C-alpha cells in the first residue's frame, strides 16, 4: 500500500495551515516591495540634483534588490510550509494505529509484504499492540487468502514484537528476503513523492 493512501487525508488537513502560512508570506512580500518603492522614491528625490539618469538607476537597483529579497523570502516560506506539513504528517502517522480504519490498513500492508517476498514460510513482525489486533483466526484467514492468490502454501508465524509505530515487517524463514512495511519505513520510502504531492497541492 503506497504512502498516498495512508497520508492523503492528512495532507488535506495540513493544507489549511499551509494556506495561512503562504498568505502571510505573500503579504510580507508585498510589504517588502512597497517599502522598497518608498525608499527608492525618497532616494530618487534626494539625488535628483545629480541627474535623472542616476536617480532612475538608483531606483531600479533598489527595486531589483527588493524583488530578490521578496523572492528569497517566498521560497523560504514555501520550504517552511512543506516542512510543517511533513511534520504534521508524521504526527498523524503516529496517531494512525488509534483510528478505526487502521486494521484494514494493517491487513493490506501484510498482504503487500507477503506478495513482495513471494509467500512460503514467513515470519510476521508487528509491534506488541498489533499482535493483539492480528489474532490467530485473522492470521489463518490471511494465510488462506494468500495461498489462493499465490497458488503456493503460505504460513505466517508470529515473530518478536518490534518497536515500530505500526505496520509490519515480513521475513522469509531463511531471512533472505525482507519486506519492511512498517508505517515509518513506508513513509520514508515515499518521502520524495509525498513532498512533490504537497508542493503540487499547495502551490
Swiss-Prot record:
One of its GO terms (biological process) is proton motive force-driven plasma membrane ATP synthesis. SUPFAM superfamilies: V-type ATPase subunit E-like. It is found in: Cell membrane. Keywords: ATP synthesis, Cell membrane, Hydrogen ion transport, Ion transport, Membrane, Transport. It comes from the Archaea. InterPro entries: ATPase_E_C, ATPase_V1_Esu. One of its GO terms (cellular component) is plasma membrane. It is a peripheral membrane protein. Gene3D superfamilies: ATP synthase, E subunit, C-terminal, F1F0 ATP synthase subunit B, membrane domain. Its main location: membrane. GO terms for molecular function: ATP binding; proton-transporting ATP synthase activity, rotational mechanism; proton-transporting ATPase activity, rotational mechanism. HAMAP family: ATP_synth_E_arch. Component of the A-type ATP synthase that produces ATP from ADP in the presence of a proton gradient across the membrane. Belongs to the V-ATPase E subunit family. Has multiple subunits with at least A(3), B(3), C, D, E, F, H, I and proteolipid K(x). This is A-type ATP synthase subunit E. The lineage of its organism: Archaea, Methanobacteriati, Methanobacteriota, Methanomada group, Methanococci.
